[in-house]
Curated annotation (Swiss-Prot):
Record-linked Pfam families: tRNA_m1G_MT
Gene: trmD
Bilayer-spanning residue ranges: none
Official protein name in the record: tRNA (guanine-N(1)-)-methyltransferase
Subunit structure: Homodimer.
Similarity comment: Belongs to the RNA methyltransferase TrmD family.
Residues that hold S-adenosyl-L-methionine according to the record: 113, 133-138
Length: 268
């Protein structure tokens, strides 16, 4: 999959795109990310990309010509088949479902706004979709575009283990259950005993219960949309008073950390 990013600050993406999973995905040829400087499509010696808003008001507005020319030049004949996204606080909320939709395309264009926004004719001419990553305002669309790239890239086949994706928050419609690893005791807090039992059926049920309970406590809107089974409703009746409190045993005394091994070794 290819991402084309249009920005006036291309340097903002350098570190983010050259580390961790995104770096490996690019090296493996699973994704390609191209950063385009909108100023390269300006026509004056000052490489101007903004001007004062018609009707008055504070700040500056990004001009339509450089952005439209940049997108049309880069996308060429693929413009009509490529989703064009404008990152904007007034856009629809970016969700995991939208990410799954976008991941089905071989190419995605992301336009990063700045200042007071982008001339609305850009959206109309390019038939662009406006997306927001949350109910807050950033100084520009670059961080938001990076979020979209990260989320969508994870859904490209081969980038992430499919089993890992299935267990993550929002992919199942619920928040994820709490995770633990070694050591089995740290600062007096022990791993929930069910996770050390080796009983995979009970572990799976506990994890499902905790996912349900955490979603009910923190994101009831997600729970209302989830397809719940009769067993899920039974598990919801067993929710602890605070599903975000520590769910394992608590130890007192000097031995606040216990080494690996023995009966308390993590079940794998």
């Amino acid at each position: 999959m290819r991402f084309d990013v249009f920005t006036i600050f291309p340097g903002m993406f350098t570190g983010f795109l050259t580390e961790s999973i995104l770096k490996r995905a690019q090296q493996a040829g699973l994704i390609e990310i191209a950063i385009h400087n909108i100023r390269d499509w300006t026509t004056d010696k000052h490489r101007t990309v903004d001007d004062t808003p018609y009707g008055g008001g504070p700040g500056m507005v990004m001009m339509a010509p450089p952005i439209v020319h940049a997108v049309e030049s880069v996308l060429g004949q693929e413009q009509n088949s490529t989703p064009i996204i404008i990152m904007s606080p007034s856009g629809e909320l970016f969700t995991q479902d939208i990410a799954r939709q976008l991941a089905c395309f071989p190419r995605l264009a992301l336009i990063c706004g700045r200042y007071e926004g982008i001339d609305d004719r850009v959206r109309i001419i390019l038939r662009a979709r406006e997306l927001s990553i949350g109910d807050y305002v950033l100084t520009g669309g670059e961080l938001a575009a990076a979020v979209v790239i990260d989320v969508v890239s994870r859904l490209v086949p081969g980038v992430i283990d499919p089993e890992s994706l299935a267990e993550e928050s929002h992919n199942s419609g619920l928040l994820e259950y709490p995770q633990y690893t070694r050591p089995p005791i740290f600062r007096g807090l022990g791993v929930p005993e069910i996770l050390l039992s080796g009983n995979h059926a009970k572990i799976a049920e506990w994890r499902r219960m905790m996912a349900l309970c955490r979603t009910a406590a923190r994101r009831p809107d997600l729970l209302a949309r989830a397809a719940l089974t009769p067993r899920d409703h039974e598990l919801l009746q067993r929710c602890p008073p605070d599903p975000f409190a520590h769910q394992g045993p608590v130890y007192e005394g000097d031995q606040l950390e216990r080494p690996e091994g023995g009966e308390q070794g993590a079940s794998r």
